From Swiss-Prot:
Alphabetized GO MF terms: 2-(3-amino-3-carboxypropyl)histidine synthase activity; cytochrome-b5 reductase activity, acting on NAD(P)H; NADH dehydrogenase activity
Entry's EC annotation: 1.6.2.2
Subcellular location: Mitochondrion outer membrane
Organism: Debaryomyces hansenii (strain ATCC 36239 / CBS 767 / BCRC 21394 / JCM 1990 / NBRC 0083 / IGC 2968) (Yeast)
UniProt catalytic activity: 2 Fe(III)-[cytochrome b5] + NADH = 2 Fe(II)-[cytochrome b5] + NAD(+) + H(+); 2 Fe(3+)-[Dph3] + NADH = 2 Fe(2+)-[Dph3] + NAD(+) + H(+)
Top-level taxon of the source organism: Eukaryota
Record protein name field: NADH-cytochrome b5 reductase 1
Matches recorded under Pfam families: FAD_binding_6, NAD_binding_1
Gene coding for it: CBR1
Subunit (UniProt): Monomer. Component of the 2-(3-amino-3-carboxypropyl)histidine synthase complex composed of DPH1, DPH2, DPH3 and a NADH-dependent reductase, predominantly CBR1.
GO terms, biological process: protein histidyl modification to diphthamide; tRNA wobble base 5-methoxycarbonylmethyl-2-thiouridinylation
UniProt keyword list: FAD, Flavoprotein, Membrane, Mitochondrion, Mitochondrion outer membrane, NAD, Oxidoreductase, Transferase, Transmembrane, Transmembrane helix
Pathway assigned in UniProt: Protein modification; peptidyl-diphthamide biosynthesis
PANTHER family named among the record's database cross-references: NADH-CYTOCHROME B5 REDUCTASE, NADH-CYTOCHROME B5 REDUCTASE-LIKE
Residues annotated as domain FAD-binding FR-type: 41-144
Length: 284
């Protein structure tokens, strides 16, 4: 007996089903690779994979994501929460990564270890391979290209971290024409964090980014500001108040209080108790 000829329609349908399944699987895997890792309500463990000391009490800590193609999933301008049980108490503190979602497979935190800083000492104690608990994102500021024509920024100490993250996002995008002026205050020259990176940004983008350093205790032949950030320094080195300008602040509370008051004297709207996206003055 002769064998019946295969039904071409069945063959076509089978091949089409196989191809469709393969394509669907490919895009599923692709979406998994690019899916954000962070969960806003659940702490997850991330291993320390690298530690780079940048000053006597400050390090850049690099934490690994589950896959080398993962992104953290943190909008520019927002932060994460680190949680730990310390002396039988649950402690949570917020930090802004200095990396962005352009970096895949890891994220970087710049953390200064304070003598009485529970979480900062907790992170400092970690060895390579050990984990910390993180959740996020959190925060009320999200940067989008072109949201303003210019930013004025004032940072004190580790308050540089959200500024650096926003700066990186702006300057990496050749289509983003936002201009940034940063006043960065510290005690001594050795306390200036990310100085090489900031100076490189200023050299490579002189039309888009300018920085002015202020030190309480400057070395000899110092050409930057001396003492505290004053209204005169703000007026000279930051953009004038306008509807197209935002002022971003991050640093020690006494400094922030003084800067908010000085900003009003320079024509900025009074800062609100809790900053929201769209405020002319935003405090991280």
């Amino acid at each position: 007996m002769s064998q019946p000829e295969p039904n071409p329609f069945i063959i076509f349908a089978t091949v089409a089903a196989i191809i469709s399944s393969a394509v669907a699987y490919y895009f599923f895997q692709l979406s998994r690779k690019n899916a954000p890792v962070l969960k806003p309500n659940d702490f997850q463990k991330f291993p320390l994979i690298e530690k780079t000391r940048v000053s006597h009490n400050t390090c850049v800590y690099r934490f690994g994501l589950p896959r080398s193609t993962d992104r953290l999933g943190l909008p520019i301008g927002q932060h994460i929460a680190i949680g730990a049980t310390i002396n039988d108490k649950e402690v949570v503190r917020s930090y802004t990564p200095i990396s962005t979602d352009d970096e895949l497979g890891y994220f970087d935190l710049l953390i200064k270890a304070y003598e009485n800083g529970n979480i900062s000492r907790h992170v400092e104690s970690k060895k390579i391979g050990e984990t910390i608990d993180i959740r996020g994102p959190k925060g009320f500021f999200t940067y989008t290209p072109g949201m303003v024509e210019s930013f004025g920024m004032i940072a004190g100490g580790t308050g540089i971290t959200p500024m650096y993250q926003i700066l990186t996002a702006i300057l990496r995008n050749p289509e983003d024409k936002t201009k940034v002026s940063l006043v960065y205050a510290n005690v001594t020259e050795d306390d200036i964090l990310l100085k090489e990176e900031l100076n490189k940004m200023a050299r490579e983008h002189p039309d888009r980014f300018k920085i002015y350093y202020v030190l309480n205790t400057p070395p000899e032949n110092w050409t930057g500001g001396v003492g505290f950030v004053t209204p005169e320094i703000m007026d000279k080195h930051l953009p004038k108040a306008s509807e197209a300008t935002n002022l971003l602040l991050c640093g020690p509370p006494p400094m922030i209080s003084a800067m908010k008051k000085a900003a009003v004297g320079l024509g900025y709207q009074k800062a609100k108790p809790v900053s929201k996206l769209g405020d002319q003055i935003f405090v991280f």
